[in-house]
Amino acid sequence: MTEHLPASQVSFDENALIAERRAKLLALRAQGVAYPNDVKREHYAADVQAAFANVETWTAETLEASSHRVRMAGRLMAKRLMGKASFAQIQDESGRIQLLIQSNVLGEDSYAAFKVLDVGDIIAVEGGLTRTRTGELSVKVNVLRLLTKALRPLPDKWHGLTDVEQRYRQRYVDLIVTPESREIFIKRSKIIRALRTWLDARLFLEVETPMMHYIPGGAAAKPFVTYHNALDLELYLRVAPELYLKRLVVGGLERVYEINRNFRNEGVSTRHNPEFTMLELYEAYSTYHEVMDLAETMIRDTAQSVLGTTQVIWDGAQIDLGPIFRRWRMDEAVCHHNPEMSVAECTDRDALLLHCERLKIKVKSSYGWGRLLLSIFEATVEHTLIQPTFITDHPVEISPLARESDIESGYTDRFELFINGKEIANGFSELNDPEEQAMRFQKQVEAKEGGDDEAMYYDADYIRALEYGMAPTGGLGIGVDRLVMLLTGSTSIRDVLLFPYMRPER
């Protein structure tokens, strides 16, 4: 049975270890070799392991008889002293490999120096290859140098990084000791690369738009406020790039996309971080139906490219991205999950208020029927959408930038994609009527004056751009962090952000 030390004892022991390591560093400084910077690495652990993986071909005898030598560097992750011969493991970005260190091969002085190394130190080694009695490929070290002295000990294999908050605060330690965490961020990079490759192949142009806005817009969200000293001007960190991207469509860039950070001054949860990554794209002469097709295919192809499968497990749910995604009108979905409601009632504010009261849903007196319908949807439907589902045809009231439906007044050509009860994407046929957009902006201004701090501002320059004429356009926004959560099976957005927002340590 492993005895776990109390936190105070662990802290005391850690301080003692740090003091011991500082003393070793002081001795190295006295020798003038504290932090050498003249090492050339030529080989990586995973490459060496793969090249000599065949145990029958590469026996200990054939390896030692060969002329193969490696020059490697990495972090010392384990050390086992055994008299005149010892074993160790180093870890580089590709993986780990075992070291066989013998005093008669390395030399007595170097062997003595190895014995006082600490786990966590970064070292360089050279040597031939061999295989142990258990069949493990090993570097038979004849040159060893300390490159970086680690002053703080890594979490031991018993305690580890059990404090989740510490994992987020000290991601540098988490990446060293948690292979699963490292793999998530490698996959994240591959997912973003796959999205770019998919869009580039379809002749979308990647662009960059401002991160600081004079007028925040493009989403119903509370912005962060900053200040430009030289211009004596209040600015806002962007909540979305939408209005700038659509200006580019006006300018004739008919297929554009941007993958970048957005900032929203809102709550923090397992699904929300104040800064997050979004993919937004716009395609001229496209409708929301075609954008749904695009989103579905892109997500499916990205999963297949990165994972080799379209089936994933997310928070205990088996998700299949292979079949055609369901498409379901918001009012029909609400009525399906609330049989006491009729589709006709979905546009009746008084009826919706009664249903909200019955369902104990808190609403504001300023809500119109659109917001009330959304409130019922969020309370009774959203969490049930496990398999990929497009919820379509949102009310105009909650969609100030979307084109109103030609078929049904009060609704828009808009969709949101839900998977396992979480919103992954949002898109619509863009509103390109400048006069209608101006009226919608004015209603947003009135809502803001009425206390809605997430309502949009009036953007006169965007209206001016629309007055030059924007082609019929479809737009899409995908929450990249949530997509990464889906494809890595992560249950918290903090698990897929290298440095998630945390309150400062006291």
Curated annotation (Swiss-Prot):
Residue numbers binding Mg(2+) 1: 416, 423
Native source species: Xylella fastidiosa (strain Temecula1 / ATCC 700964)
One protein family per Pfam: tRNA-synt_2
Residues noted as binding Mg(2+) 2 in the record, renumbered to the chain: 423
Name of the protein this chain belongs to: Lysine--tRNA ligase
Family (UniProt): Belongs to the class-II aminoacyl-tRNA synthetase family.
Cofactor binding note of this UniProt entry: Binds 3 Mg(2+) ions per subunit.
Keywords in alphabetical order: Aminoacyl-tRNA synthetase, ATP-binding, Cytoplasm, Ligase, Magnesium, Metal-binding, Nucleotide-binding, Protein biosynthesis
